[in-house]
Design a protein with these regions (language model features):
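Active-site beta3 strand of CheY-like receiver
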Residues: 46-52, 57
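The short loop immediately C-terminal to the conserved phospho-acceptor aspartate in CheY-like receiver
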Residues: 56-58, 81, 86
Length: 126
């Protein structure tokens, strides 16, 4: 799993740093954006193995951004995991139905979070 590039699209700097530090400690390379629009450009340019997408971003929301990624030939095969602090607003079933490949609630259960990442990266490499 190590050395895979993961794009983190999260507008909260503390959350972004926490996720980045966790992933880098596990050997992943990370790329970060605090806005969906910039994240879409980075995804197209760098083709990460996985995108972690906050749902409630300022500006374009995470659901709209994910749908644009899935609609683009350049990024449609990159798995996108929804990450949200709002378990009441967005549930796993509705986020997967929207088109996300995975779903995690912040704060993360570390073992579930890493297992989901491993599953999605394996899926993207096959």
């Amino acid at each position: 799993m190590a050395q895979e590039l993961i794009l983190i699209i999260e507008d909260n700097e503390k959350n972004r740093k926490l996720i980045r530090d966790l992933l880098q400690a596990k050997g992943f390379k990370t790329l970060e954006s605090d806005a969906a629009e910039e994240g879409l450009k980075l995804a197209e340019e760098r083709k990460p193995a996985l995108i972690l997408m906050d749902i409630q971003l300022s500006g374009m929301d995470g659901i709209t951004a994910m749908k644009q990624l899935k609609a683009s030939a350049a990024t449609s095969r990159i798995p996108v995991m929804a990450i949200t602090a709002s378990a009441m607003t967005h549930n796993r079933t509705s986020m997967l139905a929207e088109g996300f490949d995975g779903y995690q609630i912040k704060p993360f259960n570390l073992s579930e979070f890493l297992a989901d990442i491993a599953r999605l990266i394996g899926q993207s490499l096959s």
